[in-house]
Design a protein with these regions (language model features):
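Signature of multi-pass transmembrane helix bundles
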Residues: 1-70, 179-310, 327-329, 384, ...
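C-terminal transmembrane helix pair
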Residues: 130-131, 138-179, 183-213, 342, ...
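Membrane-embedded alpha-helical segments and adjacent helix-loop junctions characteristic
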Residues: 45-144, 273-366
C-alpha cells in the first residue's frame, strides 16, 4: 500500500511542482521584481523534460534488464552448481543457528539460508554484480515458503531491509571512482563508509525486529551482532595498518579473489559428488532468463516514476529547502551540496553515481590546487554513495521477480535504515574530513 502511495506521489508531486514552475515563468517579471525569484525558459520547458524522462527511463529500464539477464543467467547457473554439489546446503547448516533467530519462519535446514548468506557476503564485499542474482535466488526460495504469494512475508521483509541497508566492508566501486578522479588517497572513505553502512544495517534490523516482535536480547541476536562487530573492527584495524597503496591493492583484489574461490569450491564439490557440472549450470542458467523477464513491468513503472519526480525539479527544491532549514537552526551547512547524492541513492543507483561524479567534476573545475575528488563535499558524496542502497530499485526488482504486490512495511523500514545511514555518514564525514 505504501509503495502505491509513493508511486502516485512521484507523479502528482512532480506534476504540481512543474505546474508551479510554468506559472512562475508566466509571471516572471512580477515575481522577480517583488520577490526576487528568477524563472527562465528552463522552467517553461519542464513538462517537455518530464515527458522525455519517461522515454529515457523506460529505455534505461530495458537496458538494466538486458544487463541483468546476462548476469542472472551466469550466476543462477553457478548457484545451481552450488546446490547440486552440496555447497549451499553446507553453508545453510553453518549459518542456521543465527538465521533461526533472525528468520524464525525459515526451516533450519532449508537451502534458502545459503542463498541469503551468499547475497550478504557479496554485498559486504562490494560485489554488486553477483549480489543481485544471489538475492533473487534467495527471494525465490523465500517465496516457496510464503503462504500468501502476493504479499511479502516476514522473512522477505527482514532480508530485503538488511539488503537495502547495504552493509559494505570493501566499497570497491566508490574507491575505484575516486582513484579514477585523481584522489590523493582513494581509500580514505573506506572507514566512514563501513561505519555508516553498519549503522544503517543495525537500525534496519532493529526496525524490522520491532515490527515482527523479535526480541533481539532474549533471542541472543545481540550477542551475535556484538561478535560480528568485533570481527569487523579487528579486520578493519588490521587493514588500516597497511600502507595505502597496499590497502588499495588488497581491497581491489581481495573481494574478487574470494568470489572466484567460492565458484571454484562449487565446481570441486560438485565434481566430487559426481554432478554433471555443465548440465547443472545450464539448468540453473535457464532460470535467469525467466526471472529477468518477470522484473520488467515493476522496474519500468518505478524508474519512470522516479524520472518524473527528478525531471520536475522537486529534488533540487528539496535539497535547497534542507540547506535553508539547516542553516536556519545554526548547523554547519558545508555538507549540503552533497545531499543530492544522498537523496538520489534510495531512488536510483545510477542517478546517485552521476550526482557523485558531477560533484567531483564541479570541484575539479574550480582549480583548487588538488583533485576535485578530495574536496570535503566530494568526500561526503562518496560516503553517501557507499553508505545506503537503492531501496526503491531493490524493492522493484526483488519483489517483481516473484510477483509480490503487497509490500507491507518494507518501504518504511528500508527508508528508516537509509536515513540512519545518511545521518551517520554526515557525522563521520565531519569527524574524519572537516
Amino acid at each position: 500500500m505504501v509503495l502505491n502511495y509513493i508511486f502516485i506521489g512521484f507523479f502528482v508531486i512532480g506534476f504540481l511542482v512543474a505546474l508551479l514552475r510554468v506559472i512562475g515563468y508566466l509571471f516572471r517579471d512580477y515575481l522577480e521584481a517583488t520577490m526576487g525569484w528568477v524563472f527562465t525558459e528552463v522552467d517553461l520547458n519542464v513538462f517537455s523534460d518530464m515527458v522525455q524522462s519517461t522515454f529515457d527511463m523506460a529505455e534505461t529500464s530495458i537496458s538494466i534488464v538486458l544487463y541483468l539477464m546476462g548476469v542472472m543467467t551466469l550466476w543462477l547457473g553457478f548457484m545451481k552448481i552450488g546446490e547440486d554439489g552440496g555447497a549451499v546446503q553446507k553453508l545453510s547448516a553453518l549459518v542456521s543457528p543465527f538465521f533461526r533467530k533472525l528468520f524464525p519462519e525459515i526451516p533450519a535446514d532449508h537451502p534458502v539460508n545459503g542463498s541469503i548468506m551468499m547475497n550478504f557476503a557479496a554485498n559486504m564485499l562490494g560485489l554488486d554484480n553477483s549480489a543481485t542474482p544471489m538475492g533473487l535466488k534467495a527471494m525465490k526460495g523465500l517465496q516457496e515458503l510464503n503462504p500468501n504469494k502476493d504479499t511479502a512475508s516476514n522473512p522477505m521483509i527482514m532480508f530485503l531491509v538488511l539488503n537495502t541497508s547495504g552493509l559494505t566492508i570493501i566499497p570497491i566501486s566508490v574507491m575505484a571512482y575516486r582513484a579514477q578522479a585523481g584522489a590523493a588517497h582513494p581509500t580514505d572513505v573506506f572507514i566512514p563508509i563501513l561505519i555508516a553502512t553498519f549503522s544503517a544495517t543495525i537500525i534496519g534490523l532493529i526496525t524490522v525486529s520491532f515490527y515482527q516482535k523479535i526480541n533481539l536480547i532474549k533471542n541472543g541476536i545481540a550477542t551475535y551482532l556484538l561478535s560480528i562487530s568485533v570481527i569487523i573492527i579487528v579486520g578493519v584495524y588490521g587493514l588500516m595498518q597497511l600502507p595505502k597503496p597496499v590497502l588499495e591493492q588488497v581491497t581491489s583484489v581481495g573481494g574478487n579473489f574470494i568470489l572466484l574461490s567460492i565458484i571454484i569450491t562449487f565446481f570441486i564439490l560438485a565434481f566430487k559428488n559426481k554432478v554433471n557440472v555443465y548440465e547443472s549450470f545450464i539448468e540453473g542458467a535457464k532460470e535467469g532468463f525467466k526471472t529477468t523477464i518477470t522484473i520488467i513491468p515493476y522496474l519500468v513503472g518505478m524508474l519512470v516514476a522516479i524520472g518524473i519526480f527528478r525531471a520536475s525539479g522537486t529534488l533540487d527544491y528539496l535539497v535547497d529547502g534542507m540547506g535553508w532549514f539547516i542553516g536556519l537552526i545554526g548547523i554547519n551547512t558545508d555538507f549540503v551540496p552533497a545531499l543530492p547524492t544522498a537523496f538520489m541513492k534510495p531512488l536510483s543507483g545510477s542517478g546517485a553515481r552521476g550526482m557523485m561524479l558531477e560533484t567531483y567534476s564541479h570541484y575539479e573545475s574550480m582549480n583548487l590546487g588538488f583533485s576535485g575528488a578530495d574536496h570535503f563535499v566530494s568526500k561526503m558524496a562518496s560516503i553517501f554513495q557507499g553508505s545506503t542502497e537503492t531501496t526503491f530499485y531493490t524493492i522493484a526488482v526483488y519483489y517483481g521477480a516473484i510477483n509480490i504486490k503487497k509490500t507491507r512495511y518494507t518501504v518504511q523500514a528500508g527508508l528508516i535504515a537509509d536515513l540512519a545511514g545518511i545521518i551517520t555518514a554526515i557525522l563521520v564525514g565531519y569527524i574524519f574530513f572537516h
